[in-house]
C-alpha cells in the first residue's frame, strides 16, 4: 500500500524465472513515478525478487539486466531435458553472473536499503539480511536466497557460517509494515502490482505470505517459475509487468510526468531510447501503426499480450516504454547463428531425442566429474553437515517411535519395571561434526538417555560450528517425555 505521508517501501515476490515481470514493473515506475524508487525507505525481496532489488540499487542498466536473465533462460533451455539435465547448475551460474555484473562496492550501495529474505535451516525461521561488509557477502546472501531445496541441490549454501535456503520457503513477500509497503508479484493474487484475472472466482490460498488466486493462470505461472518458457513468453510477461504497474499508478493517481509512450515522437527523447524505425513516426499515427513499430520478432508478442489482458487495459498498450521494447527486441533475437538454426531443424531435433539414451550417460558422467572437482574444497564441511543432519533425522524418528512402542507394552510390565536396562532400548547418541556430548552413564534409564540426547540436539544452545544444521523446528521436550 502506498502512503505518501508515512513513507513507503517496495517488496518484490520470489518468482523464479518470472523475474522479467519485476523488470517491466520497475521500468514503468522509473518512467512514470521515479520518486517511488528514489525515495523508497527499503526494498525487500525473496529469491528472484532479491536479485532484482540488488540490481536496482546497484544501478545496473536495463539492457544488462535483461541480458543476464535471458542468458540464464537460454542456459536452462539449452539441453533436451532442460533444467533436469545434470549439467545445469543454477547456483553456479548465479554466482558467476553476480560476481561478473555487480560492482565492487555493491555492499556499500545496498546496505541499510535492502531486506533479503532467507530461510534458516536450523529452525525454518525467516531472516531478513540488510547489512553487508563485502561484495562476497552480498553474493553469498543472494545465492542462499535463491537456493531451492532439491531443485538447486542437496547441500544448502551458507552465509556467515550459517546454512540458509530460499527465502520464499518461509516468507515469499517480505516486508516490515504491510500498510506502507507496495507489493509486486507476477502471480494473480492480492497485491498492489499484479495481473488481474478474467474470472469471478474469489478463492485464494496463502502460502508463506504468497497470496494466490485459485485459477488456471496461476498454475501455469507456477510451473513456468521453475521450468522456463520461451523467451518470447517471458518478454510478454515483462510487458505485462509494465502494464500492471501503470494501472497501479493510475488507480493511485501518482503519475507525475508525461508518458513516454509509443505514440510519442523521438523528438526530445534520450538518444539511447529513440529507435531509428520510429524517426519518421508522427504524432498523428494510429494505435495500430504505433503497436506495429514495437512488435517483437514479428507480431507474436504484442498480439498474444493483447489477447491475455483485460479489455480496459488495451489503452495502456500505447504507453509501453520504447526503451524496454527495444531491449526486449534485442534479447528475443537468436544469438546462436547458423549453428543454432541448424540444431533447431526438426530432423536434427528428432535425432537428438533418439540419441538421448546414448548421449545422456556420457554427459551425466562429465557433469558429475566437474561437480566433484569444484566440490573438493568444501567437501569436508559438507560431509560433516550431512552426517549431522542424518543424526538429527534419526533422533526425531526414534523419538516419534518410542512413545508408540511404550504404549503397546502391557500395563503390568510398565508398573513392575519403571526402569528398563539400556540394552533393551534402541537408543543411539549421535555426535556433532565438531564435538560430542559427555559420555552417558551405563546405569542411566532409557528416558534419561533420550532426554539428554534430545536436549543436546534440540535445546536452545547449539554446539559451536553446528549453527543452522537442524532441519526441523524445536518443540517442548518435557511434554513428549
UniProtKB/Swiss-Prot annotation:
A GO molecular function held by the record: triacylglycerol lipase activity
Keywords: Acyltransferase, Disease variant, Glycoprotein, Hydrolase, Lipid biosynthesis, Lipid droplet, Lipid metabolism, Membrane, Obesity, Phospholipid biosynthesis, Phospholipid metabolism, Signal-anchor, Transferase, Transmembrane, Transmembrane helix
Result after altering residue 148 to M: Associated with increased hepatic fat content and serum aspartate aminotransferase concentrations; probable gain-of-function variant; 2-fold increase in 1-acylglycerol-3-phosphate O-acyltransferase/lysophosphatidic acid acyltransferase activity; results on glycerolipid hydrolysis activity are controversial with reduction in triacylglycerol, diacylglycerol and monoacylglycerol hydrolase activity or no effect compared to wild-type in which this activity may be very low; does not affect subcellular location, nor association with lipid droplets
Cytoplasmic topological intervals: 1-41
Motif (DGA/G): 166-168
Membrane topology: Single-pass type II membrane protein
UniProt motif GXSXG: location: 45-49
GXGXXG (motif): residue ranges: 14-19
Side Lumenal, residues: 63-481
Domain of life: Eukaryota
Subcellular location: Membrane; Lipid droplet
Pathway involvement of the protein, from the record: Phospholipid metabolism; Glycerolipid metabolism
UniProt-listed PROSITE patterns: PNPLA
Catalytic residues in the record: 47, 166
Residue ranges occupied by any PNPLA domain in the UniProt entry: 10-179
Record's function text: Specifically catalyzes coenzyme A (CoA)-dependent acylation of 1-acyl-sn-glycerol 3-phosphate (2-lysophosphatidic acid/LPA) to generate phosphatidic acid (PA), an important metabolic intermediate and precursor for both triglycerides and glycerophospholipids. Does not esterify other lysophospholipids. Acyl donors are long chain (at least C16) fatty acyl-CoAs: arachidonoyl-CoA, linoleoyl-CoA, oleoyl-CoA and at a lesser extent palmitoyl-CoA.
PANTHER family to which the protein is assigned, alphabetical: 1-ACYLGLYCEROL-3-PHOSPHATE O-ACYLTRANSFERASE PNPLA3 (PTHR12406:SF22), CALCIUM-INDEPENDENT PHOSPHOLIPASE A2 IPLA2 -RELATED (PTHR12406)
Name used for this protein in its record: 1-acylglycerol-3-phosphate O-acyltransferase PNPLA3
Amino acid at each position: 500500500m502506498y502512503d505518501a505521508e508515512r513513507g513507503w517501501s517496495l517488496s518484490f515476490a520470489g518468482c523464479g524465472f518470472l523475474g522479467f515481470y519485476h523488470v517491466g514493473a520497475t521500468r514503468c515506475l522509473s518512467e512514470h513515478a521515479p520518486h517511488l524508487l528514489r525515495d523508497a525507505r527499503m526494498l525487500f525481496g525473496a529469491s528472484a525478487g532479491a536479485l532484482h532489488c540488488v540490481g536496482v540499487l546497484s544501478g545496473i542498466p536495463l539492457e544488462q539486466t535483461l541480458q543476464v536473465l535471458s542468458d540464464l533462460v537460454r542456459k536452462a533451455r539449452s539441453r533436451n531435458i532442460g533444467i533436469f539435465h545434470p549439467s545445469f547448475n543454477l547456483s553456479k551460474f548465479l554466482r558467476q553472473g553476480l560476481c561478473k555484473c555487480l560492482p565492487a562496492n555493491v555492499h556499500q550501495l545496498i546496505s541499510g536499503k535492502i531486506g533479503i529474505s532467507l530461510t534458516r535451516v536450523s529452525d525454518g525461521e525467516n531472516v531478513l539480511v540488510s547489512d553487508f561488509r563485502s561484495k562476497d557477502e552480498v553474493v553469498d546472501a543472494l545465492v542462499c536466497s535463491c537456493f531451492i531445496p532439491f531443485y538447486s541441490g542437496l547441500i544448502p549454501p551458507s552465509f556467515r557460517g550459517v546454512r540458509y535456503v530460499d527465502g520464499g520457503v518461509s516468507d515469499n513477500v517480505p516486508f516490515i509494515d504491510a500498510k506502507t509497503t507496495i507489493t509486486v508479484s507476477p502471480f494473480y493474487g492480492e497485491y498492489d502490482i499484479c495481473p488481474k484475472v478474467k474470472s469471478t472466482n474469489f478463492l485464494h490460498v496463502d502460502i508463506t505470505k504468497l497470496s494466490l488466486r485459485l485459477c488456471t493462470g496461476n498454475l501455469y505461472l507456477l510451473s513456468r517459475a521453475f521450468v522456463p518458457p520461451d523467451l518470447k513468453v517471458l518478454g510478454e510477461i515483462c510487458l505485462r509487468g509494465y502494464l500492471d504497474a501503470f494501472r497501479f499508478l493510475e488507480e493511485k493517481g501518482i503519475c507525475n510526468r508525461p508518458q513516454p509512450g509509443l505514440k510519442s515522437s523521438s523528438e526530445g527523447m534520450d538518444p539511447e531510447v529513440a529507435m531509428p524505425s520510429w524517426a519518421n513516426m508522427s504524432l498523428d499515427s494510429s494505435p495500430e501503426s504505433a503497436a506495429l513499430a514495437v512488435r517483437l520478432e514479428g507480431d507474436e508478442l504484442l498480439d498474444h499480450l493483447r489477447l491475455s489482458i483485460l479489455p480496459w487495459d488495451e489503452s495502456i498498450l500505447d504507453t509501453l516504454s520504447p526503451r524496454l521494447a527495444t531491449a526486449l527486441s534485442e534479447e528475443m533475437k537468436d544469438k546462436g547463428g547458423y549453428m543454432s538454426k541448424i540444431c533447431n531443424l526438426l530432423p536434427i531435433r528428432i535425432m537428438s531425442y533418439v540419441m538421448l539414451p546414448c548421449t545422456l550417460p556420457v554427459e551425466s558422467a562429465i557433469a558429475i566429474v566437474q561437480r566433484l572437482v569444484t566440490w573438493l574444497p568444501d567437501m569436508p564441511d559438507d560431509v560433516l553437515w550431512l552426517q549431522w543432519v542424518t543424526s538429527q533425522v534419526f533422533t526425531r524418528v526414534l523419538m516419534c517411535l518410542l512413545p508408540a512402542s511404550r504404549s503397546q507394552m502391557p500395563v503390568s510390565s510398565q508398573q513392575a519395571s519403571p526402569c528398563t536396562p539400556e540394552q533393551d532400548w534402541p537408543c543411539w547418541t549421535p555426535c556433532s561434526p565438531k564435538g560430542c556430548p559427555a559420555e552417558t552413564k551405563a546405569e542411566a534409564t532409557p528416558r534419561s538417555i533420550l532426554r539428554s540426547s534430545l536436549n543436546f540436539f534440540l535445546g536452545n544452545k547449539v554446539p559451536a560450528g553446528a549453527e543452522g544444521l537442524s532441519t526441523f523446528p524445536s518443540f517442548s521436550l518435557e511434554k513428549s517425555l
